[in-house]
From Swiss-Prot:
UniProt KW keywords: Coenzyme A biosynthesis, Cytoplasm, Magnesium, Metal-binding, Transferase
Protein's GO biological process: coenzyme A biosynthetic process; pantothenate biosynthetic process
Binding site for 3-methyl-2-oxobutanoate: D43, S44, D82, K111
Organism whose genome encodes this protein: Pyrobaculum aerophilum (strain ATCC 51768 / DSM 7523 / JCM 9630 / CIP 104966 / NBRC 100827 / IM2)
SUPFAM superfamilies: Phosphoenolpyruvate/pyruvate domain
Cofactor comment: Binds 1 Mg(2+) ion per subunit.
Protein name: 3-methyl-2-oxobutanoate hydroxymethyltransferase
Amino acid sequence: MSARRRVTDFVKGKGPYVWVTAYDYPTAKIVDEAGVDGILVGDSLGMVVLGLPNTLGVTLADMIRHTQAVARARPRALVVADMPFMSYETGPRDALRNASKLIKAGADAVKLEGGAEYARIVEKLVKAGIPVMGHIGLNPQRVLALGGFKMVGRTEEQRRKLLDDAKALRDAGAFSLVIEFVPASVAKEITEAVDIPTICIGAGPHCDGQILVLHDIIGLTERPPSFAKRYANVADVIRSAVKQYVNEVKTGQFPSKEHFKE
C-alpha cells in the first residue's frame, strides 16, 4: 500500500495531480482505491447529495459529518474539507475555530473560496498549523452576487484580479489553489505566475492538476456542467438493479432458498 499523502507532497512540477470529490465512506474508499491523489469533501454535497439549489445552505455540521465519513475510509489520499458559506467570512477568529473542527473531523487541510480579501484569514489558519487550499475564479458561494454560475476572467479587469488573488493567497501560505471556470489562457497565466500547484475545474489543461465532482463523472448528476466528462452511467446501473429487485419480490423470486434458512 502506498504511503498516505501529505500536504508537502503537493509541489510545483510534480503533477499532474488528480482530485475528485467524495462525501461518504463507500465512495471515498472506492476513489482512493482508484488512485486519486486528493479527495475534496466539497460543499457541492449540498447540490449533489442533499438536493439543494446551490451550496449556500450547507452547514458546518454537514461538513463535519461528511468529513468524518470520508476520513474513516481512506488510507492514502489527502483529504481536504470545504469551509462552508459564512464559516470564515466573519473574521479570523471564527475561521480558526471552524477550520479546527474540520481538522479534528479528519481533514488534512481546508479549502476556502475567495481572493486577496481573505488572505489575512488564510495566513491566520496557516500560522495556526492548518493547511489551506485556496479557490479563485467562479466561487459557488458567491452565486447570488454573480447572478448565476458564470465564467470569470473574460475581462482584463477580472484577469488582473485573478492574478492578484492567486499571488495574495500564495503569499498568505496556501499550499495549493483551485481555479474554477475561467478561460484556459487565464488559468495558464496564473499557473505560471505562482509557485504552488494549481488545480483546474473547468479551466483547461494548463494547471498542475484537475478536479471534478464525482457525481458528474459517474453519471449521477442530471445536468452536469459543460466542463465535466461523464465516464460512466451509474444511475442506469442502480435503476436496473432496483427494478430487478422490485420485479423479483413482486413475482416471488426473492428471497430464494440461498438467501434464508428455515
